[in-house]
Amino acid sequence: SQADEPLRIGTTYMTMNNPFYSVIDEELRLVIESRGDILLTRDPALDQERQNEEIRDLLHEDIDLLVLNPVDYREIEPALREVQKAGVPVVVIDSQVSNPDLVACTIASDNYGAGVLCAEHLMNTCDSAKVVLIEHASTKSGMDRIQGFCDTLASHPDFQIIGRADSAGQLEVAMPQMDRLLEQGIVPDAVMCLNDPSALGAMAALQEHGLLEKTTV
């Protein structure tokens, strides 16, 4: 009977080039397949147009649920409207979308609060600092972390933002971006990165310039 058919669950994350999303997908797969259901995973590789197309393909695969981590929290909306029209519920993880009415629920950390904690830690360990930001401007989670950090430092003039660059949350992008800033003479006391891969990239660039031991990341 139709009731006995396995559920088909589609997932698409902003990139599988981040171990964080690989772990999430592996844990989902363990639970879903243990119930006899089917997980269909897609990787847009940080391309929102590609992610929108993947979602359309998943709809053609007759999925019953979409688990989503959007590449761009605004540009995902056309695909979400198609999913809503198809009557498929959406669970957003580790980020948000610009129109929450298009999803069933959102599961995310307090990213703004995480940024606040990073700023507080920096102020507790340093009397002053010139800071570089390594960002990911198209993701709400990344934006919120940086915003929480900046808002917390705003009333402390001894902590100044002297440069910023977008890494798309990727090690291989963060490294040359940090290198570019250093070559421009922008030498920070601290670097605030939105995630672990971008921090590793920034650290690699600082290491090449002999600055890692002098810089808080």
Protein language model annotation of sequence segments:
Residues 24-37:
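A short, Lys/Arg-enriched amphipathic alpha-helix followed by its capping loop at the start of a domain
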Residues 27, 54, 75-82, 148, ...:
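A short acidic, amphipathic alpha-helical/loop segment
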Residues 1-9, 33, 126-127, 189:
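Immediate post-signal peptide segment of exported/extracytoplasmic ligand-binding proteins
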Residues 65, 69-113, 124, 139:
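Flexible loop/hinge segments that line or gate small-molecule binding clefts
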Residues 33-35, 83-88, 152-160, 184-187, ...:
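Short helix-capping segments at alpha-helix termini
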Residues 12-26, 41-50, 72, 106-117, ...:
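Hinge/beta->alpha junction and helix N-cap segments in small-molecule ligand-binding domains
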Residues 10-11, 63-70, 89-93, 132-133, ...:
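Periplasmic-binding protein-like
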Residues 49-63, 172-187:
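Short, well-structured alpha-helical segments in soluble
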